[in-house]
Swiss-Prot record:
Record GO terms (molecular function): chloride peroxidase activity
Species this chain originates from: Burkholderia pyrrocinia
Keywords carried by this UniProt record: Antibiotic biosynthesis, Chloride, Oxidoreductase, Peroxidase
Subunit (UniProt): Homodimer.
Matches recorded under InterPro entries: AB_hydrolase, AB_hydrolase_1, AB_hydrolase_fold, Epox_hydrolase-like
Protein function: Chlorinates and brominates suitable organic compounds. Involved in the biosynthesis of the antibiotic pyrrolnitrin.
Family: Belongs to the AB hydrolase superfamily. Bacterial non-heme haloperoxidase / perhydrolase family.
Start and end residues of each AB hydrolase-1 domain: 24-259
This protein's name: Non-heme chloroperoxidase
Matching Pfam families: Abhydrolase_1
Coiled coil: none
Gene: cpo
EC assignment: 1.11.1.-
């Protein structure tokens, strides 16, 4: 299997499909999943002639289960290691949830200064800041994330069933069509990763203030968010991010969940393609 070794000797797994001379689209997955969460998008774009790449974040999926470095700076640096190893240029970076935070940090710190980024997309993304603080009074209280940590530590396998069965895909809403395969695939991806990485990752996605990252991004950036996102509430994420981006476009989806890339893939794929081609 293909791996890139980072500067701190962490092996990062990646998938690389399509013509090597085509425009690359790089996908950054959410917590606690893997590059497999992008199957619907990768198949769609590779069939359109693009080169598609998705890596597993450190401690997630097939990447090394290291003890340290489960923070946004290392996430972004690991992504840059993949980009450099594959010499990707003119790339579109698409991030979901925590992966959206990874994209924002990567573009701001590495990709944009190196001239390797054409566009960025933040889907149901965590920036600018999820945690409630004095400067972010609309955020979620720390007790919410402490609850995540306790549930993970007490019984990770059950927690990783409860999340996709309930709020992640909106399967807890009246009249929702529940897809058991989607639930099982979420659980499979989560359990493939490291409990330590997942535990530490809760702090990374909830407490990292990415206000300055967003302000520094100048490439065209598309912000997509479901209006019924029960995981990353839109009011404290996309509606704030769009005000910080210099060259941003916002599109919201009434009734759509945090996991809309999977359960509404046909709609999202069409919108992503339109942005990439614009």
């Amino acid at each position: 299997m293909p791996y890139v070794t980072t500067k701190d000797n962490v092996e990062i797994f990646y998938k690389d499909w399509g013509p090597k001379d085509a425009q690359p689209i790089v996908f950054h997955h959410g917590w606690p999943l893997s590059g497999d969460d992008w199957d619907a998008q990768m198949l769609f774009f590779v069939q359109k002639g693009y080169r598609v790449i998705a890596h597993d974040r450190r401690g997630h999926g097939r990447s090394a289960q290291v003890s340290d470095g489960h923070d946004m700076d290392h996430y972004a640096a690991d992504a840059f290691a993949v980009v450099e190893a594959l010499d990707l240029r003119n790339a579109v970076h698409i991030g979901h949830s925590t992966g959206g935070g990874e994209v924002a940090r990567y573009v701001a710190n590495d990709g944009q200064p190196a001239g390797r980024v054409a566009k960025a997309v933040l889907v149901s993304a965590v920036p600018p800041l999820m945690l409630k603080t004095e400067s972010n009074p609309e955020g979620l209280p720390i007790e919410v994330f402490d609850g995540f940590r306790k549930a993970l530590a007490d019984n990770r396998a059950q927690f990783f069933l409860d999340v996709p069965t309930g709020p992640f895909y909106g399967f807890n809403r009246a009249g929702a069509t529940v897809h058991q395969g989607v639930i099982r695939n979420w659980w499979r991806q989560g359990m493939e990763g490291s409990a330590k990485a997942h535990y530490d990752g809760i702090k990374a996605f909830s407490e990292t203030d990415q206000t300055e990252d967003l302000k520094s991004i100048t490439v065209p950036t598309l912000v997509l968010h479901g209006e019924d996102d029960q995981i990353v509430p839109i009011a404290d994420a996309a509606l704030k991010s769009i005000k910080l981006l210099q060259n941003g476009t916002l599109k919201t989806y009434p009734g759509y969940s945090h996991g809309m890339l999977t359960v509404n893939a046909d709609v999202l794929n069409a919108d992503l393609l339109a942005f990439v081609q614009a």
